[in-house]
Amino acid sequence: MMTISLIWGIAMVVCCCIWVIFDRRRRKAGEPPLENGLIPYLGCALKFGSNPLEFLRANQRKHGHVFTCKLMGKYVHFITNSLSYHKVLCHGKYFDWKKFHYTTSAKAFGHRSIDPNDGNTTENINNTFTKTLQGDALHSLSEAMMQNLQFVLRPPDLPKSKSDAWVTEGMYAFCYRVMFEAGYLTLFGRDTSKPDTQRVLILNNLNSFKQFDQVFPALVAGLPIHLFKAAHKAREQLAEGLKHENLSVRDQVSELIRLRMFLNDTLSTFDDMEKAKTHLAILWASQANTIPATFWSLFQMIRSPDALRAASEEVNGALQSAGQKLSSEGNAIYLDQIQLNNLPVLDSIIKEALRLSSASLNIRTAKEDFTLHLEDGSYNIRKDDIIALYPQLMHLDPAIYPDPLTFKYDRYLDENKKAKTSFYSNGNKLKYFYMPFGSGATICPGRLFAVQEIKQFLILMLSYFELELVESHVKCPPLDQSRAGLGILPPLNDIEFKYKLKHL
């Protein structure tokens, strides 16, 4: 008589055989090389997740510039030749770039789909972002951010004894705290009826945001949030504060949020909590990548004496040209859009910091079967398959960026110290050479504001503070690979630094 263990063993073998026969895709003529992986459903997901860059490089060496991997039940075609990126984007009529993003948002934040095709709303969210994050709207948003950054960095009630003392703090923790508070106030305004509890509320939200953000990669991977009780509670608490009844009593709410409140109320069938969760999605999008990007920009600038010197000279010159005088009395400084855009050294520092730390995954879903025509050949793509670009491969390619792992603050400056816009790969000029914010239709609509708020932060840190690393020759912390594919990778460990207000 067969034992239970033997029965289970036979059952497992049968299941594996069924999987091999029916679940594994067979490569057809004209399709890219295929990696199914060994694990049902997951495919190559574990190998990809442990180190995406090395996984893709290994497959690039094995298969060439185009190959297909099964990841979490989906078939993903990776295009790894940066010279082909513009060719991919020319096939836009075959792509649905919204499907993945809408599905991910609903899954992670807990609202119904915001895709107008699903019938829950008729709002075109991309038009909303374009209208409120660019042009004249960007001017008012940047002005509010500059005011709020100065409010956070130089609070009006700061005792003189504290202003004269050196403060030692983790740099990532410092950037997280400052950028979250200033960014929250800029988007969602402030409750002037409760000034004493305003900061406590935001710091509570900061802690909730950290808890929720910690599990975000797992949510994107498809795990339900109910598996993470603390993160689920944190998400609901964050959303509670963003209900319309709470936002309506706040002053200086951004045009973006005011318009979204109006459109949610007039064009959607969302309940109050779902409306709040669509605002939570905006909060996450405004913070999750900006915070680590701010850290890397500040860290790399302070760590490089040449970068620190060049940035300080540029900022001092810009303030003098604008007639802005630094004062210990708390007078705010301000640079307009034109002045902020005319800071090529800071631009280059930020770009170089993001080049070294970004690991975004540019994704598009095939709406139908079609043939993808690239520089090095044509490939048949099946409906519902995913086309993916992983720009970190390009950002760290020595053929494009010599000595790619070294921070060079002037890498994006030409011989005239102006913005450098021409980069080459093996003698061929690249149309796309810097892509931390995505590309084409999927490019981040808030990228201009993100760069400006980082730039404003650096201007204020250079203007008001003396800055030092506790360990002057500290090594660059490794990147946290658990967030690969989501954007800017945070440091795996924090770096201590010292700061104190300058005597102006």
UniProtKB/Swiss-Prot annotation:
It is found in: Endoplasmic reticulum membrane; Microsome membrane. This is Cholesterol 7-alpha-monooxygenase. Catalyzes a rate-limiting step in cholesterol catabolism and bile acid biosynthesis by introducing a hydrophilic moiety at position 7 of cholesterol. Important for cholesterol homeostasis. Heme binds at C444. It comes from Cricetulus griseus. It catalyses: cholesterol + reduced [NADPH--hemoprotein reductase] + O2 = 7alpha-hydroxycholesterol + oxidized [NADPH--hemoprotein reductase] + H2O + H(+). Its EC number is 1.14.14.23. PROSITE patterns: CYTOCHROME_P450 (PS00086). PANTHER family: CYTOCHROME P450 7A1, CYTOCHROME P450 FAMILY 7. Its main location: endoplasmic reticulum. The lineage of its organism: Eukaryota, Metazoa, Chordata, Craniata, Vertebrata. Pfam families: p450 (PF00067). Belongs to the cytochrome P450 family. GO terms for molecular function: cholesterol 7-alpha-monooxygenase activity; heme binding; iron ion binding.
